Amino acid sequence: DTFGTDAVRWYLMREMPTGADASYTLERFLARYDELANVLGNLVSRSTSMINKYRDGLVPEAASNGLDAEIDYALESARSAIERLKVHDAFAAAMDLARAANVYIEERKPWAQAKDPELASELDETLATLARVLVVLCALFQPVATEKMDELAVRLGLDQVPTLEKAVAEDMTGKKMSTGDPLFPRVHPESMDTTT
């Protein structure tokens, strides 16, 4: 109950490659859960919060997207991994895209862009890029985190989790985003009951 079935599926997909033996340890499970919370969950929280704070929740229009190459690479890597029956590699590619988006936030510094009216178009590009990444990640993670991606789709202003093809083509401009509790709440191991 603490982690939910999505986290268990994530652990199984990441730690137990198809056709190979694997073992379970609480330490490895917590490490994989932290990956969900600190990388994907943090990206969702930061991105939706900034779009709400700086653009009243509406995804702005932008002339270009800053992470197109990273999105293309993640999609190609995921497709290639699936064809080779390396499902764990497909989800690793999805998580790498989330990491790239977190780096993008640190490099672009939207909080600084928001303070300078002359950087309004750059801020729009930053926020639109993050929205596009989130919709692609929603589709990429859907097979393994079905419940949480349903939640994310609602936050992104979508009727449902899109297929990967629709996610790539989705025009997020004008979509109304909402915020919410962390998708994957941080868990402190010292507070866990490990006797059961």
Model feature map: region roles:
Residues 22, 80, 85-86, 95-196:
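Basic, alpha-helical terminal appendages of large translation-related enzymes
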Residues 3, 28-39, 63-71, 83-93, ...:
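Secondary-structure capping and boundary motifs in well-ordered enzyme cores
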Residues 1-64, 159-191:
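Catalytic adenosine-cofactor/nucleotide-binding cores of aminoacyl-tRNA synthetases and other
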Residues 17, 44-78, 102-119:
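Conserved, charged catalytic cores of large soluble enzymes
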Residues 6-7, 28, 66, 70, ...:
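Exposed alpha-helical structural elements
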